[in-house]
Swiss-Prot record:
Reaction(s) the record says it catalyses: methyl (indol-3-yl)acetate + H2O = (indol-3-yl)acetate + methanol + H(+); methyl (-)-jasmonate + H2O = jasmonate + methanol + H(+); methyl salicylate + H2O = salicylate + methanol + H(+)
Activity regulation (UniProt): Esterase activity is down-regulated by salicylic acid (SA).
Record has Hydrolase as a keyword: yes
One function term, GO molecular function aspect: hydrolase activity, acting on ester bonds
Biological processes annotated in GO: defense response to fungus; innate immune response; oxylipin biosynthetic process; salicylic acid metabolic process; systemic acquired resistance
Gene label: MES1
Main EC class the enzyme belongs to: hydrolase
EC annotation from Swiss-Prot or TrEMBL: 3.1.1.-
More about this protein: Expression of MES1 can restore systemic acquired resistance in SAR-deficient tobacco plants.
Protein name: Methylesterase 1
Amino acid sequence: MSEEKRKQHFVLVHGSCHGAWCWYKVKPLLEAVGHRVTAVDLAASGIDTTRSITDIPTCEQYSEPLTKLLTSLPNDEKVVLVGHSFGGLNLAIAMEKFPEKISVAVFLTAFMPDTEHSPSFVLDKFGSNMPQEAWMGTEFEPYGSDNSGLSMFFSPDFMKLGLYQLSPVEDLELGLLLMRPGSLFINDLSKMKNFSDEGYGSVPRVFIVCKEDKAIPEERQRWMIDNFPVNLVMEMEETDHMPMFCKPQQLSDYFLKIADKFV
């Protein structure tokens, strides 16, 4: 294989309340071995200060920066698409629209919908198993003309004990400084038509299990894999919900192995 063909384009999608900034450790590791990396700020996230989450009524609109990026790619270019946490829903929307532009989709301890149920199904299951006290003071506020939207802002305790408990304290501080309100768009996703086997379901999928994740525990990650089986499961030991901070070198090595296998 030529050196040029070996170089891949990785597109990295953050989770709720985060931004492209959360890939700051992984991006240079992939670039150092010659790959192209685009870390996307979704709508009203990261440095997109043109809008707040209360201006974004649907998950489709929230995903627009990702779908616009894929639209802009040359017809013959395929990407390795990575989604973290809620970013799995953004991946699914992109995969449904552009299956031909994605070599493989990587669900990094991410919500992974199926094609049999509503797009909100995995979130509904997650919510039914997550008691209110487990959110540790995370703020939820209705928004929109009919109050059908629900914004979410992680509490410092939830971030420290539920998301970043094994990550460096400096990365926790970075997260506390840069965190913005997000949404899970559950009402909107419950009204969307199911993802299709021909679109979303046709793209090869990899799931990376983070074994010490307290936000989406290992059993919930494995339930999603059983619910909609993937092509490959990889595991990260002693890794919390933020593997890009907790184990950036191992994570980037995993991404390279995935690209070698599926591209």
